[in-house]
Design a protein with these regions (language model features):
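Positively charged
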Residues: 1-114
Length: 114
C-alpha cells in the first residue's frame, strides 16, 4: 500500500492556513491520511502534513475518525506537554496544549456538529 510522503518542518505548508473543503474531497484526503498514519505509526495527522492545503485531519486514539473543516471553539486548562510530531522526526517538542478542547467540524450531511 503506497502512502503519501510526510512533509518535514520547516516546509511552509506546515504553517500556512488550510482551506475549507467539501465532503468528497475531505473523504479522499482522509483515506490517504489514515493510510499514511498507519504506515508511520502516529496518533493523528493533518492534510498539510502530506502536502494538501485542505482543512482535514484524522485521529486514531481509540476509535479512528476524521474531521472536515475543524475549528477549536473552546479550550480548558492549559498545560505544558512534551510530544512528538511526524513532521519533526526523532524529536520530542515541549508545547502548550489543553486538557480539554471543544471542536466544531462539518458533518457528513454538511451540517455542523460538536
Amino acid at each position: 500500500m503506497e502512502t503519501k510522503q510526510i512533509v518535514i518542518y520547516p516546509n511552509d505548508i506546515l504553517s500556512t492556513p488550510t482551506k475549507k473543503t467539501d465532503l468528497e474531497t475531505a473523504q479522499k484526503i482522509a483515506v490517504e491520511l489514515f493510510k499514511t498514519l498507519n504506515q508511520e505509526g502516529g496518533l493523528g495527522l493533518s492534510a498539510n502534513q502530506i502536502g494538501e492545503d485542505k482543512s482535514v485531519c484524522v485521529v486514531n486514539v481509540t476509535n479512528p475518525f476524521f474531521l472536515q473543516n475543524p475549528k477549536i471553539v473552546k479550550k480548558e486548562k492549559e498545560i505544558i506537554y512534551k510530544e512528538g510530531c511526524l513532521s519533526i522526526p526523532d524529536k520530542m517538542i515541549t508545547t502548550k496544549r489543553y486538557e480539554k478542547i471543544w471542536v466544531e467540524a462539518d458533518n457528513i450531511d454538511d451540517t455542523m456538529f460538536f
